[in-house]
Amino acid sequence: MNSRLQEIRARQTLRRKLLAQQLGAESADSIGAVLNSKDEQREIAETRETSRASYDTSAAVSKRKLPEEGKADEEVVQECKDSVEPQKEEENLPYREEIYKDSSTFLKGTQSLNPHNDYCQHFVDTGHRPQNFIRDVGLADRFEEYPKLRELIRLKDELIAKSNTPPMYLQADLETFDLRELKSEFDVILLEPPLEEYFRETGIAANEKWWTWEDIMKLDIEGIAGSRAFVFLWCGSGEGLDFGRMCLRKWGFRRSEDICWIKTNKDNPGKTKTLDPKAIFQRTKEHCLMGIKGTVHRSTDGDFIHANVDIDLIITEEPEIGNIEKPVEIFHIIEHFCLGRRRLHLFGRDSTIRPGWLTVGPTLTNSNFNSETYASYFNTPNSPLTGCTEEIERLRPKTPPPKSDRGFGASRGGGRGGASAGRGERGRERNRGSFRGDRGNFRGRGGPHRGVFAPR
């Protein structure tokens, strides 16, 4: 009991210190001098009551009936003057603006250590976007508090660096170039088309031809994708979400994930973009749709995918106006997730050429691609895959085994989604996600109804 009391007191002391820092007080004991005291709050309440009473009095005078017969007009006039004089005195007083200094104004929950965490209001006041305050977003410090994940990322990066093919690139106009001339099938295809939306938001003239979604849909992606493959399509933040799904469907892929790029403005707060004519608010994120072709199971296809290694969010600083390049972190997400070595980047640039990838784009300044040389890197049966070590297999997140394989005691009782959830094959089918190769996209535990009874 004493330890619990000491813990509560320590939290209270820390909370008061943080409050003092936020409110500009000298110390935790001087918070009361900054906040409204009880006398000030009582004075504000009395002022409101006086104003309300004076308003009621003036309304009563305006609705007063005609004077009775025999009552002197001078008495009526004198009563009206007596009721109007207090109102004139209040009007002559200087206007006093109410300044709300109470710390509970923006308090979200009684256990909050930071009472002024209304980031939307902070954006209005300073121009700093709310996502600026998300911590540990960089690749270097993201897993500082998770040593196993940090070690897993290090081992995978070392293995990827050893198994990468030399960087290859080809300057080609994708409007007229036949992708089948690459003479190869690919496990991963990343598309970064220059959409009209990018140039419309920046408000500057395009230095390269922008593509419409009709042109993007005409690309022969289905002709160069392997029997099981993934496609990653950058589609902006507007109507591209719908058109991107249409492209995936036309190419024979199923949409399975949406990777969001959240843009911060720490270096240049308050920077505004040209507002899209179809938008009400300024958009500060972009979407990269991920599609899958073929059948990929997380539990059985560990030689081709490693799920749940990364998250589906990229949080980086927004590039300068006119720069439509995407964050380099998308390459790390793809390489950590898919173990296929045949990677193709369409609409690439000189700055995106990297080992392990074939980069094709109209803005490249040089070419070194040779179809025979590229095919020679994948002659042996297992050469299209990066492989896996015992340590990586031990550290990587895996799909939980079925309940029937966990032991005698673990299979007792039903799932959280109802009586039938978790029993036999039907229960496992209900617990299975909508995408078998998904990176953790489960609909919930025990079926679609999480912890409640199924609707009648």
UniProtKB/Swiss-Prot annotation:
<comment type="similarity">
    <text>Belongs to the MT-A70-like family.</text>
</comment>
<feature type="site" description="Interaction with METTL3">
    <location>
        <position position="298"/>
    </location>
</feature>
<feature type="region of interest" description="Positively charged region required for RNA-binding">
    <location>
        <begin position="245"/>
        <end position="254"/>
    </location>
</feature>
<feature type="site" description="Interaction with METTL3">
    <location>
        <position position="242"/>
    </location>
</feature>
<dbReference type="GO" id="GO:0000398">
    <property type="term" value="P:mRNA splicing, via spliceosome"/>
</dbReference>
<feature type="region of interest" description="Interaction with METTL3">
    <location>
        <begin position="135"/>
        <end position="136"/>
    </location>
</feature>
<comment type="function">
    <text>The METTL3-METTL14 heterodimer forms a N6-methyltransferase complex that methylates adenosine residues at the N(6) position of some mRNAs and regulates the circadian clock, differentiation of embryonic stem cells and cortical neurogenesis. In the heterodimer formed with mettl3, mettl14 constitutes the RNA-binding scaffold that recognizes the substrate rather than the catalytic core. N6-methyladenosine (m6A), which takes place at the 5'-[AG]GAC-3' consensus sites of some mRNAs, plays a role in mRNA stability and processing.</text>
</comment>
<feature type="compositionally biased region" description="Basic and acidic residues">
    <location>
        <begin position="65"/>
        <end position="74"/>
    </location>
</feature>
<dbReference type="GO" id="GO:0021861">
    <property type="term" value="P:forebrain radial glial cell differentiation"/>
</dbReference>
<dbReference type="GO" id="GO:0061157">
    <property type="term" value="P:mRNA destabilization"/>
</dbReference>
<dbReference type="GO" id="GO:0007283">
    <property type="term" value="P:spermatogenesis"/>
</dbReference>
<feature type="region of interest" description="Interaction with METTL3">
    <location>
        <begin position="278"/>
        <end position="287"/>
    </location>
</feature>
<dbReference type="GO" id="GO:0016556">
    <property type="term" value="P:mRNA modification"/>
</dbReference>
<keyword id="KW-0539">Nucleus</keyword>
<feature type="site" description="Interaction with METTL3">
    <location>
        <position position="245"/>
    </location>
</feature>
<feature type="region of interest" description="Disordered">
    <location>
        <begin position="43"/>
        <end position="74"/>
    </location>
</feature>
<dbReference type="GO" id="GO:0036396">
    <property type="term" value="C:RNA N6-methyladenosine methyltransferase complex"/>
</dbReference>
<feature type="region of interest" description="Interaction with METTL3">
    <location>
        <begin position="237"/>
        <end position="238"/>
    </location>
</feature>
<dbReference type="GO" id="GO:0003729">
    <property type="term" value="F:mRNA binding"/>
</dbReference>
<feature type="region of interest" description="Positively charged region required for RNA-binding">
    <location>
        <begin position="297"/>
        <end position="298"/>
    </location>
</feature>
<feature type="compositionally biased region" description="Gly residues">
    <location>
        <begin position="410"/>
        <end position="421"/>
    </location>
</feature>
<dbReference type="GO" id="GO:0001510">
    <property type="term" value="P:RNA methylation"/>
</dbReference>
<protein>
    <recommendedName>
        <fullName>N(6)-adenosine-methyltransferase non-catalytic subunit METTL14</fullName>
    </recommendedName>
</protein>
<feature type="region of interest" description="Interaction with METTL3">
    <location>
        <begin position="308"/>
        <end position="312"/>
    </location>
</feature>
<feature type="site" description="Interaction with METTL3">
    <location>
        <position position="146"/>
    </location>
</feature>
<dbReference type="GO" id="GO:0019827">
    <property type="term" value="P:stem cell population maintenance"/>
</dbReference>
<keyword id="KW-0221">Differentiation</keyword>
<dbReference type="GO" id="GO:0006397">
    <property type="term" value="P:mRNA processing"/>
</dbReference>
<dbReference type="InterPro" id="IPR045123">
    <property type="entry name" value="METTL14-like"/>
</dbReference>
<feature type="region of interest" description="Disordered">
    <location>
        <begin position="395"/>
        <end position="456"/>
    </location>
</feature>
<dbReference type="Pfam" id="PF05063">
    <property type="entry name" value="MT-A70"/>
</dbReference>
<comment type="subunit">
    <text>Heterodimer; heterodimerizes with mettl3 to form an antiparallel heterodimer that constitutes an active methyltransferase. Component of the WMM complex, a N6-methyltransferase complex composed of a catalytic subcomplex, named MAC, and of an associated subcomplex, named MACOM. The MAC subcomplex is composed of mettl3 and mettl14.</text>
</comment>
<dbReference type="GO" id="GO:0001734">
    <property type="term" value="F:mRNA m(6)A methyltransferase activity"/>
</dbReference>
<feature type="compositionally biased region" description="Basic and acidic residues">
    <location>
        <begin position="423"/>
        <end position="441"/>
    </location>
</feature>
<dbReference type="InterPro" id="IPR007757">
    <property type="entry name" value="MT-A70-like"/>
</dbReference>
<dbReference type="GO" id="GO:0042063">
    <property type="term" value="P:gliogenesis"/>
</dbReference>
<dbReference type="GO" id="GO:0005634">
    <property type="term" value="C:nucleus"/>
</dbReference>
<feature type="region of interest" description="Interaction with METTL3">
    <location>
        <begin position="255"/>
        <end position="258"/>
    </location>
</feature>
<keyword id="KW-0744">Spermatogenesis</keyword>
<keyword id="KW-0694">RNA-binding</keyword>
